[in-house]
């Protein structure tokens, strides 16, 4: 009779030898609605579940598609209703307190921390420093640790040191491919750091028109690397309202 393999010793051995090793499954336990039943179902096959904690979600689309409204409005409001603390990183300098409050977002310091930054390196350092302190405080009690959601609006406006240096020198030659690599590294590290904790990230990004006549769909800026690294990517676009027989614009399907 074949003996059953006992993985107890092996599990203890690799746990001691590999720092930060995760064993077992880390399925999401907390979900935040996007405020749109159709979008929730598209993302998770559940009308009430949208953004999962422990994952990285990207909403990409053209200007006016509603990315900021959903990410910085609906999702933050619904997260706060669930007792989740939100860290909002504004890279576009476009999120006004009055606009957020009009969307029923609680802007008090005990519910929301708003940070304004423009460098992708600064965003990475901010997330890294937060995770170091978070892990030190809650390493022994992951289930009882506070729930946190990062919102970045948007990835497309982030700059690299190369962008800044060239602007100051008056030489606009592009970032030489550094930004796609930096965004990929940012998303990949966030996915790895958040997996075992009740921490999530939702970010918006821009799209641009495709130059390929055989592939006319809009392309997401920042390269393909971070798209594959993200847990969920939603491509959005804006459509005109339909008109009824009397010429009135309607939003019904």
Q: Where do the model's predicted regions map?
A:
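The Walker A/P-loop phosphate-binding site
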Residues: 2-110, 123-132
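Amphipathic alpha-helical transducer elements in NTP-driven molecular machines
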Residues: 32-36, 53, 68-69, 116-128, ...
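Residue-level signature of catalytic and energy-coupling elements of molecular machines
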Residues: 39, 100, 153, 205, ...
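Active-site phosphate-binding and catalytic loops of NTP-dependent enzymes
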Residues: 48-49, 84, 136-141, 195, ...
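Glycine-rich, flexible loop segments associated with nucleotide phosphate handling
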Residues: 50-57, 142-150, 175-179, 221, ...
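Structural motif
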Residues: 55-57, 85-87, 148-150, 200-202, ...
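Conserved inter-motif catalytic segment of the P-loop NTP-binding fold
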Residues: 62, 74, 78, 82-185, ...
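Phosphate-binding/switch region of NTP-binding enzymes
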Residues: 176-253
